[in-house]
């Protein structure tokens, strides 16, 4: 899923930040992500205010993954894969975020997310370094997204 693929990219983000000694937290970047997401939400018929908790949960989960990778690499071997530039990875993340907003909007046209939808998403949301609580937080925030009136 786009959601899982987005989380898988956090390994690349963490590796880049480790290599270049950048902090995981980037408040300015987060503000830009919120602004872009709210604009995309409007463009896709979603209530931009309802998308905020979902985007926050994605960013929180993304940071959790990055911190956990950094902890693993600091106590073991460092990344041994080619490290993408942050701009390339962020471009892909932005594409996935936009794809998710389109999918969410289309799904909400026929009604709210069902229990079955959430069960399906949970089974397909299996990115490394996320625990059940992290996943539950993202899915709970997803359930708050609404279409614009």
Description of each model-found segment:
Residues 21-40, 78-88, 113-127:
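Charge-rich, acidic-biased intrinsically disordered regions
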């Amino acid at each position: 899923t786009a959601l899982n693929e987005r989380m898988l990219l956090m390994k690349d983000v963490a590796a880049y930040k480790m290599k270049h000694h950048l902090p995981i937290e980037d408040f300015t970047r987060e503000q830009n992500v919120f602004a872009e997401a709210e604009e995309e939400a409007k463009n896709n018929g979603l209530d931009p205010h309802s998308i905020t908790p979902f985007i926050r949960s994605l960013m929180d989960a993304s940071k959790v993954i990055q911190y956990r990778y950094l902890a693993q690499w600091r106590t073991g071997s460092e990344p041994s894969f080619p490290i993408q530039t942050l701009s390339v990875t962020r471009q892909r993340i932005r594409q996935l975020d936009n794809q998710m907003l389109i999918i969410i909007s289309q799904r909400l046209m026929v009604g709210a997310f069902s229990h079955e939808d959430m069960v399906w998403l949970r089974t397909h949301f299996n990115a490394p370094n996320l625990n059940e609580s992290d996943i539950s937080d993202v899915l709970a925030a997803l359930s708050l997204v609404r279409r614009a009136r």
